[in-house]
């Protein structure tokens, strides 16, 4: 009976330390249920309004400064 109690206490300590370490680990963003961008969202990103517009890919660039950032 005493061995069982000691075993349960050791298991509880190990589980609590594991939970503490997992809590400190940075959480990754999970987007497997999110949908992709719509055509309107893609088009909005491509239509640059100024020289410093953000672009993701080289074919999204609308100006020379944006092209330099993408390259």
From Swiss-Prot:
Assigned GO CC terms: extracellular region
Disulfide partners: 48-62, 55-66, 61-70
Entry keyword set: Cleavage on pair of basic residues, Disulfide bond, Ion channel impairing toxin, Knottin, Secreted, Signal, Toxin
Compartments, as annotated in UniProt: Secreted
Tissue expression pattern: Expressed by the venom duct.
Propeptide: 20-43
Signal peptide extent: 1-19
One Gene Ontology molecular-function label: toxin activity
Source domain of life: Eukaryota
Task of the protein: Inhibits voltage-gated ion channels.
Family of this protein: Belongs to the conotoxin O2 superfamily.
Domain remark from Swiss-Prot or TrEMBL: The presence of a 'disulfide through disulfide knot' structurally defines this protein as a knottin.
Designated name of the protein: Conotoxin Vc6.12
Species per Swiss-Prot/TrEMBL record: Conus victoriae
């Amino acid at each position: 009976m005493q061995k069982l109690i000691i075993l349960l206490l050791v298991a509880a300590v190990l589980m609590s330390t594991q939970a503490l370490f997992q809590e400190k680990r940075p959480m990754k963003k999970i987007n497997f249920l999110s949908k992709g961008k719509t055509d309107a969202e893609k088009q909005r990103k491509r239509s640059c309004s100024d020289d410093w517009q953000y672009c993701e890919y080289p074919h999204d660039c609308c100006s020379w400064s944006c092209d330099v950032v993408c390259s």
